[in-house]
Amino acid sequence: MMAVSCSGCTISCGRLRFERAKCCKHEFFGVLQGSNLEFLQCKYPLFTSSSRVLGHKVNVFPGINDCFWEKHSTPLLDTINSPQDLKNLSNKELRQLADEIRSEIIFLMSRACAPFRVSLASVELAVALHFVLNSPVDKILWDFGEHSYAHKILTGRRSKFHTLRQKDGISGFTSRMESKYDAFGSGHGCNSISAGLGMAVARDIDGKKNQVVTVISKWTTMAGQVYEAMNDAGYLDCNMIVILNESRHSPLPISEEAGSQTSLNPISSTLTKIQSSKSFRRLREAAKGVTKWMGKEVHEIAAKVDEYARGLVGPAGATLFEELGMYYIGPIDGHNIDDMVSVLSELASMDLTGPVLVHVVTEVGRGLKMDSKGEEKNDKNEGRATNSKDYSSGDTSPSKTYNDYFAEALVAEAELDPRIVVVTAGMGVDLSLGIFQQKFPERFFDLGMAEQHAVTFAAGMCCGDLKPFCVIPSTFLQRAYDQVIEDVDLQNLPVRFAITNAGLAGPNGPALCGAFDIAFTSCLPNMIVMAPSDEDELVNMVATAVSINDQPVCFRFPRGIVFAKELPLLGTPLEIGKGDILTKGKDVALLAYGVMVQSCIIAHSVLSRLGVNVTIANMRFCKPLDIELIRMLCREHSYIITVEEGTIGGFGTHVSQFMALDGLLDEGTVKWRPILLPDKYIEHASVKEQFDMAGISGHHIAATTLCLLGRNREALSLMR
């Protein structure tokens, strides 16, 4: 028995019941969940592993090209409910388990159309760690959210993995509130060594013997905190293991038997095992003690011999870690289970004499199908939050992001002004900036995860009479706040801060939420703070920033998608500190900042149907405020509502302070209400769901307005 429809169809066949979403193509991925096989539209080509095909095509009706991809079985993974279930597996079974986990991640994440390529590099590493260690007694810290996906599957969260980054689902990062196996929360990266060192010191004070292992990525080695923590770990000589997962992009030769896919040779593997052996460690420590006892000259000679020997075993960079006090082991093929288990077992079984750094080399996107050019045919975004288009809704309308309009406007300005340069600390995440990089490669500087350096670097450029645009996501600018104050604002240098991904972060949750930038920039004495209401104003604010040469300026915009429309790429500079009236009403004035103008327009539409006409003011500037406009609105309205997608201490605070100091609230004829993000972290969900959770949607604004007017029953009906 079988029934098919092209829209929300139900297919019954034997004991299986199939459901699928509305389609614009006739290709789907099927996801087995119990006795159900669910469908979602597939936006990616078929992915294949190095050793197996992850799914096979099943036709529903021959000749119609209506089909789905059936997921392969995962017999070993189906038996794993916790890390303890790995303990009795052989190395061969561990390799099979890694293949099945990789299959699971590719299948489910492709279905969600979410970036996941980085997670495929750490599958074998997670398997080896949980096989050797006794988690959660032994602490495993991941400083990069995507690297922990296999870890999540192995620690009892497989059944919820399809809810990753969704409302009421599991987080895309490690979270202490989510699982006892997550020793520490990850978010911005580069924090795991510091946190792990703290745990190791606490362990030693308590007289415990558990292991502490931190996993860092090559991206986080760009951040200064990593080296501060390594230096302190070396100074304290504290026993802990740091694993540097160097994920590479280039496809490498495949060894089907061992599942190896790195350029590391057998000699390197053998030497790495020697490095991690007890006898080698003891001999080396004994030699250090003897040479120190024999005197300075002999000690220096031995150190040079030791450094030379280390050069035979590890890469040149190993000496940097050694100088920081870390005992270096590597490089290891991060996809070779046998080598990883061998090295980790040796380290776990011995009494360490200080911190150890294990260098593993892995491949980003391992297991994904390559095209004819050797490039992976899938989402190119990985690492931090991206601004790529979200296809999960099935929307295929022509659209662009705010970042696209920003980059195009900046290119247009740079063609006229050769002093304009771009400094970004986005690790290549903002793909829109690629057009600037291609057009002006010598004027484009991507510094990786080095926000502090980026800000001061841009400040130095100002001293050299350049016009730097410092492009940093809101949440990552927090890490460079000291530099923003001391190196830019205090010296009144005209760095132009383009604060991307501002506001709620949707699936990325509170870790990457850009909620605080309005508050922490608007309190700085010399900073001009502005935000566009739409893409047209964004183009104008780029032109405005170019025209400001005597003080710093910042403007924020979200990662959101807008319907693509043709705009003049050269904007018109705005008058500093001036807003605009969009709609004229009475009684209530909505003072909107940034893209919250759009929510106010929705509220205006809702309220007008209820016979309420409100004034909408597009304020544009948080600092300096349009004080004449505020005075006029206070004279003509009984209620003032400030609306912003930011936290306490931002736009609404500045407006209320001005009204209080100006005496506008003294007679009691004007009442003020703020609409802003609540004083709590908003968990991951879609942006629309987060707006409802935070109470800043158009309907919430309309309900607040009705409550001010005493129409509480109508306000409640809007919230149902």
Positions of predicted regions on the chain:
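N-terminal chloroplast transit peptides
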Residues: 1-49
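N-terminal organelle-targeting presequences
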Residues: 29-99, 103, 110-111, 717-720
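Active-site pocket-lining segments that scaffold enzyme catalytic pockets across diverse folds
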Residues: 108-137, 355, 362, 402-415, ...
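Long, structured ligand/cofactor-binding scaffold of large enzymes
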Residues: 92, 96-207, 211, 219, ...
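Extended, hydrophobic alpha-helical segments in both membrane/secreted and soluble proteins
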Residues: 212, 216-229, 432, 444, ...
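Helix-enriched interaction subdomains in cytosolic or periplasmic regions
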Residues: 382-390, 522-568
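A short, small-residue-rich loop immediately preceding and capping a beta-strand
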Residues: 112-114, 138-141, 182-185, 206-223, ...
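Thiamine diphosphate
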Residues: 3-12, 155-191, 205-209, 230, ...
